[in-house]
Amino acid sequence: MLRYSVLSSQTRLLSASRQRTATQLLANPIASNRIITGQRYFADHKNVPPTSPTPVSPESQSVIPPQTVNPVTATPTAQVQTSPPSSIQPPKPPVETPSSSPIPPPTPKKTGRFRRFLLYLILTSGIAYGGGVFLALKSDNFHDFFTEYVPYGEESVLYFEERDFYRRFPNATRHSNRLPPIHKEQSQRVTIPSKSGLSWKVSEEESDSASLTQKGPHNSAVDASKDASAVKTVIKAKEESAEKKAPVKKEAAPPAPKEEPRTPAIATPATLELIKVEGADEPVVQELVRIFNDIITVIGADEGAATKYAAPVSRVRTEVETIGQKISSLRADAEKAAKEEVEKAHALFDESAKKLMQQIEQARAAEAAQFREEFEAEREKLVRAYQEKIQTELSRAQELAEQRLKNELVEQAIELNRKYLNDVKELVERERDGRLSKISELTANVNQLEKLTTDWSDVIESNLKTQQLQVAVDAVRSVLEGATSAKPFIRELVAVKELAADDPVVAAAIASINPTAYQRGIPTSSQLIERFRRVAGEVRKASLLPEDAGIASHAASFVLSKVMFKRDAVTDGDDVESVLVRTENLLEEGNLDAAAREMNTLQGWAKILSKDWLADVRRVLEVKQAVELMETEARLQCLRVES
């Protein structure tokens, strides 16, 4: 229903919008043509009127000549009306004066607010109602509210609950209206026993207990009576329905002879009575009675079982009633004993409460006396403290008054002195204007000269310090370059450090020098070359040794090193002889850094033998690099002073 209403409302809205669109398509070209035909230019081509006949409106069959219609300029895109024809009739032009007929204005566009509001209201109401039904099926509290206050809420919820029930249990009402099946009499059944005929086994006598549990002539008297009564009821119902359906005009057929029902051999037993225990308030007794009543109900449903188990059921009823009476008596005895215990506990509690109240009263009296004494002591203490506070406040107020008076006197004296100084200053200014008018200018010039002198003295001092640092660095270099042997240069380095105490670069350079270098000195270039030649001889001897060489390997390497030829310095190679030749050439050129790099490429025994020489070369390079860094910093400070 809700979906159909929404679709119908959408269809109405679409048809209304189509009608408005068609009306606008009919009206807008006319107005635009009036504007276009009024604007003509010399470059425009004259529009040729269409030769096709003018379409005739559905209401009017009169033919309008094409000369009476205003020419319409062709647009790039033709507008084709795809909507159904509008119900609004176009205006009929007058026949007498077709040129002066006014064109009607376009119809105002309908907003459709009411339809849109109605559509939104219906959609919102439907969604809210559906959501309410869904919540009512999920929540019990909302179910009560929805079915009580919302119109048709209870019917909607019941409808969906029934649908849910039928979906879960599709076979619930399928066999509800059918009649019970008619059972045939036991005498009409023809059965063949399973053990009939011949068999290879010797026949055995069956026990009586097994025959009693099986169906047969010995226990089918009740069933036969039940089947006979059921057949009689069904036959009677069919005859009554046939008599009602038979027509009145036709004579009724003679009824068939009715078969008299056979009387059962055993009389129908009386129904078993349920167990009722008076005063059974205990849950255990009630549960026991309910269980036995269920058993009695099940037994009573079967007539043969009711007769068979009547005596045990009566005995069980008696036992259950006896048990109920015993439980009631035990409960009464327990209640009586509990009541006595409660009375004793109440008496004991009353005595204890009286004793406790007496103790509380005594403790309260003692505490009241103690509190009274403490209160008096505290009151006296507060009185003394209050009096001391009053005395202190009075003394402070008196001191403040005296101090305020002294301050006022001092302020008056200061004010008098200020007035006196102002008078003196005015007199001095007058005198200065008269005789000493140039003193302020002279004082300013003197201050400026003092400032310039101070600045130049700072510049001279920094320049002198920079020159001293440069001299100290040159002294260190001269000691290193002019020495013929290893010579310590501690004094020169200490002088540099004292002169550049505030320079972090010079301090870092001095700290990078190994203490052994400036305490014992560093070897000269000639000493390094001489020592390298000695080390090179040993390296050549061990150049052919493997890492795990023995005595024989050492002897063989020593012999072969004597017959090895010395290579040229420009040869390239990674062998020991090539590295030694290149290193010696670099040492003769004075390039210690490259020589150390070449020797560092050696491996094995050659590198182990040249380890001490490499350490000396590194120490020399570190000292030279530090001295160069200090010289650069000294030059930089000189440039700063000059700028």
UniProtKB/Swiss-Prot annotation:
Keywords per UniProt: Coiled coil, Membrane, Mitochondrion, Mitochondrion inner membrane, Transit peptide, Transmembrane, Transmembrane helix
Gene Ontology cellular-component terms listed: MICOS complex
Bilayer disposition of the protein: Single-pass membrane protein
Residues exposed to the Mitochondrial intermembrane side: 138-643
Renumbered residue ranges of the record's region Disordered: 44-110, 173-263
GO biological process: cristae formation
Annotated coiled-coil segments of the chain: 317-451
Segments on the Mitochondrial matrix face: 43-116
Residue span of the annotated presequence: 1-42
Bias-annotated ranges (Polar residues): 59-82, 188-197
Listed Basic and acidic residues bias regions: 236-262
Segments of skewed composition (Low complexity): 220-232
Main location: mitochondrion
Record-annotated membrane-spanning stretches: 117-137
Subunit text: Component of the mitochondrial contact site and cristae organizing system (MICOS) complex.
Family the entry assigns: Belongs to the MICOS complex subunit Mic60 family.
Name of this chain's protein: MICOS complex subunit mic60
Originating organism: Talaromyces marneffei (strain ATCC 18224 / CBS 334.59 / QM 7333) (Penicillium marneffei)
Organism lineage: Eukaryota, Fungi, Dikarya, Ascomycota, Pezizomycotina
